[in-house]
Each structure stands twice: as structure tokens, then as C-alpha cells.
């Protein structure tokens, strides 16, 4: 899929690499995600070994430099969105858990220091799943992602972190958490929290359809962090982080909705009433058609946003 230019029209045809990835992702979504999604949701837990299987797809290691053990490939928001869409067709919660470490990796590549990249990124290149996540949302009705109320204060030898984050994916077990907080007298900043330091608590959250995601509320009560926990030099570009996060969620939503539409089409063609499939009823057919129209609009808006992000445009 190509970005628009003055020389050619906007091209929505997937390139060879994207088509190859599509085959891989759709096969994985069918055989490894959808096949276990229902039982996993009812059990409220991810199947054993599932995330290590997703690690074999290499989604997190692809953009990591070769010097750190990765593939050293360029990052393409369009391709990332396509991959997320194809996987989410299988199940939204399992896919979101699988791709959550990508946000951590990409943010480190974007805004981390060389020392932080060298310290953390090689872990993602060992062939096993690394539970890494980002913590942005906060438990209040008026939450504004650009104005976090979780605070960080400079103290001797580091920072003191206080506040709460909610709906953190993989929050129950994540070994690395990128916490967005308001740095005193500076503005929004990001901090890398390893493990569960003193003063940090994790509380599981259960939400319909997301029970396998290990969502949790993370509370920080004067958690002491070292100096090098501050991401980069402290000048965190929160708007870029939020924009790319929203783009990823949009792609996941498109894939999930495509899965719903495919299910509905099969159902209305198989369900028989008064001697014929209910899809023959115009009222039903119109509803399904409206779903397809809205879904295609969602997809095209997401692809356009990904294309703009790939060009560095707003």
C-alpha cells in the first residue's frame, strides 16, 4: 500500500510484503486465536503458551536494530495497522495482549535514550514473549490523556511516583511498564517501571470481552525510581504517543468488526424462517449492508490516518 503523492493516486493495493504478511496473520488469527478465544474468555485467562506463539510472529523484534538482536527493519504504521487488523479478526482481547509490547518497543525506539534501548530491547529478541505494557488511562470520569494526574517528583537519586492508572493491558503480570506521569515543573513524561517495586499494587479488572487481557489498575504510592527510569531526556512527546496508540486501537477495532460482520453474514444466510433464509428479508439485508458500509468507512479512515503517520503528517 503506497502513500499518496503528486505523481500518482492513493493506492490501496497491498504490496508483496503486505500480502505475504496478510496470509501469515490471517492463518494465525484463524488457527491460533479464534480457535481458543471463546474458551479463553470463559476461563478469564490466556491459554498457556499462547503469547510465546505470538512472539514467533516477530512483531516486536522487527524494528529493533540488528546490533541489538532485532531485524533492523524500518517501521511502517500502515503495515502495523494491517497486521493488527488481520489478527484482531480472531479476537480483540487476545490480539491486543499480543501487540501491547509493540507500543513499549516503538516508544523506546522513538523517544528512549541509547542506554535504555541497549538495556531493554535485546529482551524482545530472544524468541519468547516479554510482557511489557504502557500505562496511560486514569480512573476518573474527566480523564484527559494530555493532562495526566499521576505525578512524578524529583528526589535524591531519582523520582517518586504517585497516582493510579487503570485498564492497563497485561497489567497483572507485566514485567516492564511505561508509566505516563506529570513531572513536576516540566510537564508529561514517561517512566520505565520494572517488576513490582515497593509502593506499587496491581488490582485485576474484569470487563466483558476483555477478560483474557489481564487488565489491571496500577496504584503507585511514593514509588521510588532511579534516575535512568525517566524515558529519554524527559522531553516526552505525549501527543505522538497518544496519536499512534489511537491508530493501533482503530486498526484492532476494524479487525474485530470484520469478524463480527463475517459471523453475521454466515448466520443470516443459514438461519431459516418461514421456509427461507432471513437474509432474503429486505429489512435484514439492509441492516447487514449498513454494517458493511460503516465498516468500510472505518477501514479507509484508519488506513488514511496510518498513511499520514507514515509520512510524518498530522
For each feature predicted by the language model, list its residue ranges:
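A structural signal for short hydrophobic beta-strand segments in well-ordered beta-sheet cores
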Residues: 150-153
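Glycine-rich beta->alpha junctions and the first turn(s) of the following alpha-helix
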Residues: 10-14, 21, 202-297
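Intrinsic disorder at enzyme termini
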Residues: 1-17
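Structural signature of FAD isoalloxazine-binding scaffolds in flavoprotein oxidoreductases
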Residues: 73-83, 144-147, 219, 224-225
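C-terminal helix-coil-helix/basic helical segment that borders enzyme active sites and/or dimer interfaces
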Residues: 34-45, 265, 269-277, 292-314
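A short core secondary-structure module
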Residues: 162-203
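Internal helix-loop-helix
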Residues: 56-129, 169-176, 309
